[in-house]
Each structure stands twice: as C-alpha cells, then as structure tokens.
UniProtKB/Swiss-Prot annotation:
The gene is CCT8. One of its GO terms (molecular function) is unfolded protein binding. This is T-complex protein 1 subunit theta. Molecular chaperone; assists the folding of proteins upon ATP hydrolysis. Known to play a role, in vitro, in the folding of actin and tubulin. Contributes to stem cell maintenance through its impact on transcription factors trafficking through plasmodesmata. Probably involved in refolding translocated, partially unfolded proteins, including viral movement proteins. It comes from the Eukaryota. It comes from Arabidopsis thaliana (Mouse-ear cress). It is found in: Cytoplasm. GO terms for biological process: positive regulation of transport; protein folding. Keywords: ATP-binding, Chaperone, Cytoplasm, Nucleotide-binding.
Amino acid sequence: MVGMSMQPYGIQSMLKEGYRHLSGLDEAVIKNIEACKELSTITRTSLGPNGMNKMVINHLDKLFVTNDAATIVNELEIQHPAAKLLVLAAKAQQEEIGDGANLTISFAGELLQNAEELIRMGLHPSEIISGYTKAVSKAVEILEQLVETGSETMDVRNKDEVISRMRAAVASKQFGQEEIICSLVTDACIQVCPKNPTNFNVDNVRVSKLLGGGLHNSCIVRGMVLKSDAVGSIKRMEKAKVAVFAGGVDTTATETKGTVLIHSAEQLENYAKTEEAKVEELIKAVAESGAKVIVSGGSIGEMALHFCERYKIMVLKISSKFELRRFCRTAGAVAHLKLSRPSPEDLGYVDSISVEEIGGVTVTIARNEEGGNSISTVVLRGSTDSILDDLERAVDDGVNTYKAMCRDSRIVPGAAATEIELAQRLKEYANAEIGLDKYAITKYAESFEFVPKTLADNAGLNAMEIIAALYTGHGSGNTKLGIDLEEGACKDVSETKVWDLFATKLFALKYASDAACTVLRVDQIIMAKPAGGPRRDAAQAAGAGAEED
C-alpha cells in the first residue's frame, strides 16, 4: 500500500525518473526573468567608457580582467537555460557587428524587468509580447529618422572619417587611450582594405602582443610578425623570393622499415654520400629557382639546413598551419607539400624579412611595403598579459566596427542621446495607442532610460538629474543632446563627437527584443536528469563534490 501511495502523479507519471518540471507564472516565467536580470546586472556596470572591469577566472584557471561583455559571458559558463538565450543574443551581436554585446544583454534584462512589473499588475505575457513587437517596429522607424544626414556615404580610406565612427566603440573598452588605438587600427584596416570595401576581411588585421613598454610603443607592420627565430645563421634578407613547404624540409623516408646490406666500408661511405647528394640536389634546385627564403611547416633536417647555409638561404619554421596560410597570403606564395623545385609562379615575395628583438622577445618580421599584400599586423606593447589581452579586445572591436561601417556607414548620436529620443517618441506613440498594448509600449520606452542611468552611475554622477536634463533638452527639440561624462553635464554630441554606428544600435535593439520575447513566451520548463559519466572537464570534476546542489 505504501508503494502505491508514493507513485508519481500528473506530468511526472509520464516522464522518466529524475525529470524536473516547472510551470506557471511564478515557477517558470518569473524565475526565468530573475535569471536574466541577474545576468544583465553583472554586465551592466561595465557599460560605457567609465564601466568597471570584471575579474573572471575560468575552469582552466585562466584570469580575465575585462569590461568586454562578450568575453565575460563567454567565460562564465552559464547553466540557466533562459539566461543562455541572452548569451546567444550577445554572441549573435558580437559576430554581426563586433560591438554592442553589453547593450544587448543589459537592454534585454531591462525589458524583462519591466515585463515582470506588468505581469504582477495582471497583464498576460502574450499581451506584453504584442506590445513589445509593436514597439520594436516603431523604434526601428524612429532610429532611421535619427541618422545623421550625409553619413550614408563615406570614404572608408579617409582616416579622420573612420576614426570619428570608431572612437565610441574603442573608448568603451579603453577610455583615454582611444586616440592611439583608433589611429593604429585605422591605419592597419586602410592598408588591407580591398577595392570593394564590403569584402573587407577582419582576419587580415592581425594582433601581435609583446610584453614590455607601453601602448605608446605600439606600431603597425605591413606584413607579418612571427614570434620565432630563424633557423640557422642567416637572420636577414632584402627583396627576397620565398618558397613555402608545408610538409617540412627534410629527406623523405618511407613509412615501412628498409634494411640495407652493406659489405664494405666503401659501400657505407657511398650510401651516406648518395643521401647527401639527394638533399643537396633538392636545395640547389630551390636556390636556382631564385628563392632566398625557405619557410617550412614541419621539421627541418640537419643536412638540409647545412646545404641551405651553403647556398645562403634563410630558413624559417612556422608550426601553425593557420599562420602558414597567412604567411602565404602575405608573401603571395603557394605552399608545396614536400621539398621540390618550385615553379616561378609559386614563389612569394617579401620586401624584407629579418629577425629583430622587441622588448626581450625575438620576433621575425616579414614586411611587404608595396601594395597587393593582404595582411597587416598591429604590434601591441603593454606591461602585463591582462592589459595586452584587453588591448587586443579593443583592437578587435575597432576592426569589427570598420567592417560594419564598410557595409553601412550611417551614424546616430551617441552618449545616450539616441536612447532618450527613442524613449520620448515611443512614450508619445504609446499614449496614442488604445488597448492593453499601450502599457507594454510605455514600459519598452522606459527600458531605454537604463543607458543614461547606467552611464551616469558608472561615472559617479547623479542619474536622476542627468535624465531629467536630457528629457528637458529633447522635449525642446534638441535631438542630439547627450551626456558629456568628462564634464558631468549634458552636451550636444556634435561638439563632443560621440557617434555610434546605426547598425550597432539596430541589431542590439532587435536581438535584445527577440531574446526578451522568447523568454516571455516560455511557460513550462521540463529538464531531464543530467547524464552520468565524467564531467566536461577535470576542473569541474575536482570541485563537483563542493558544488553539488
């Protein structure tokens, strides 16, 4: 009888043992909203130029000190399924534009927080979703009206125009150093910009991080910087043709074992000589083809190196196949699988290739000053690895912003001017609506206020005063009034030159709204019992006993 009374009931009777089932407003919807709010609370304090850094130590004990939201959420290993939706939205934003991940997460969190208030007032989630959907369409319409006139066309090779659009994205990561970084990134991007700018490839701008010095010691190399020394004694070549061998520079040996029967000392001597002659013949053929530099993707035999020295050929080893591909792009070479005589069209060319020492690190620099090469390297200098990693993220943001502006160069006012204008116009739109949608549209409009509030809070200013001043200015028709964080007052963005890309705002707004509506549409969560077996990594397994909940 006891066994009968303990049998599962309802949906549990249908599922396997260990399943968890959550349903209803309180258990599913509100819990999901709370998880998303927690995530947005983490990233929100990192928004804007005065944003705080987060110190994240991942499961491999790697330390991250950054205010880049995309990096933070990537390394947090979030388990909650609803919060994961926001992470996916941020990743989509990062891949599409390369900037605005924080805006996406924080805005989605704010939308959900306001939705929770409406749910507690008695509105049904479907009514909120309907209102939010209308608000998104209207917001996109308003955003297009706020585009700065004349920004539809730009010369992507004009340094000043590019920097004006890139400054805000880089300043949000490295405030105070944006001028140096923007200048470096712009030069690097313009060098490798193809004839059709929409085909710009972010992989063509590389970053090489070298410890020591400071950011002001950073420079740009038109070509590649390899963190390795040349093999052999030849360390420099000018105007050299390059032969690339992916499989290594060594005598080829068969995979099966060969046995040789030798009767006399002469035969032994001749056997060694034939091997030597074979290697010399191959190296001589490479030298006669005009190549002064050999780049190997594998091992370099001692005998081969000896003959390379004799024929005055510089030898480099690049173990990474990705680096080898980039080197081929830099030099315009075609990689051969094994050591053989290269044809003239397969040879690459570099203006100079030399081994240099920068800050105690030996690097090989391959330069190609003439046009036509497609790789540019930003050499970053800094005192610690964490600083260099963060500088690299700022450079990546700058390069991605350049790619975005090559496709769509339109700009909108930054410094929270766009958000306040959107909030104000959406509130007017909501007042004209009839039905329950108006409450959701009003809350959607209020959600935009988190941007000026967060920017002011992070800069230590009085948020309420700033927002009130912004609303007053925008109400009197000044659509470009934003926050000047340095002076702690409201100022026209035409003076402060803070512009954001239209595409960044548009995609952040769309992705955040989609993520928020997706979370609100969920009314039941059914979770299987986690599969047994080893954890995903040893670090988790070690701490599993302590973490088991």
